[in-house]
Amino acid sequence: MSLSGVALVTGAGGAIGRAVVLGYARHGVTRIAGLDLDSNCLQETASTLASSYPGVQFLPIVADLASEEQVAEAIARVVAEYGAIHYAANNAGIGRPYGLTHETDTADFDRVMSVNVKGVFLCEKYELQQMVKQDARRVNPLVPSALERGSIVNTASTLGLRAMPSLSAYNTSKHAVLGLTRTDAVDYAQRGIRVNAVCPGFVDTPLLLESTKRALACTIARIPQARLASPDEVADTICFLSGGTASHINGVALPVDGGFTVT
């Protein structure tokens, strides 16, 4: 798999986002923009990328994706710097306040929706505004008709495909991401833009503390592969869906969960 052009990654300071940045570089992208609210984590991503792939340009942008003004400014900066956006990985999201619906604080619900749903919507809105202006490129050398202006991959969750108890806000937000993904996959297909979603299950990140892993032991035992996903496995799936190898894949919600959703 070989990718070329400009990539944009949101949540680029987190474990999965950083893996996506490195994944795009590993597969050939030489101009990458990374968005995150945490400037320190974003700088860690920049340093890791520079060490591993010194020839790759990286544009770090600190932005709150729940703010339309900040998203619009961030996308404009990427286009001003690199001239286009060929791949967008909308990966940013926040955690899951536990609670039944009648127990969930409305402010907590609103915060989850503002980042996990509104944030993805805003990113797509301004990414698509740019992509529809771009010239179509032939992305699959074996398929002359595979012409694309861009490709978007949204990070949803296996909890967008099923529900876990006591996660009212988070479950709802990830189902909404899949609704947006499918809608835009249909609406923009004939404009040469594919929109897909990746649905990670339980991912082995620094945020998953050892105590949490022990609490998840019963769940992990239900995963046919009997282990957590690596951030790199999620990243490689995003890179695959982004590129021309997946030129006829559109509107999917692809689990990266070791078979958990089919058990």
Region locations from a protein language model:
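Short, small/polar-rich loop/turn modules that mediate ligand/substrate recognition or access, typified
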Residues: A189, R194, I249-G251
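Residue(s) in the substrate-gating loop at a strand-loop-helix junction
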Residues: S157
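C-terminal substrate-recognition "lid" of short-chain dehydrogenase/reductases
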Residues: R227-V256, F260-V262
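Active-site helix of classical SDR
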Residues: E124, S173, T181
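Alpha-helical segment proximal to the catalytic Tyr-Lys
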Residues: Q129, V186-D187, S247
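Canonical Rossmann dinucleotide-binding motif of NAD(H)/NADP(H)-dependent dehydrogenases/reductases
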Residues: S2-A33
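Substrate-binding pocket helix/loop in short-chain dehydrogenase/reductase
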Residues: G99-T101, D108-D110, L208, T219
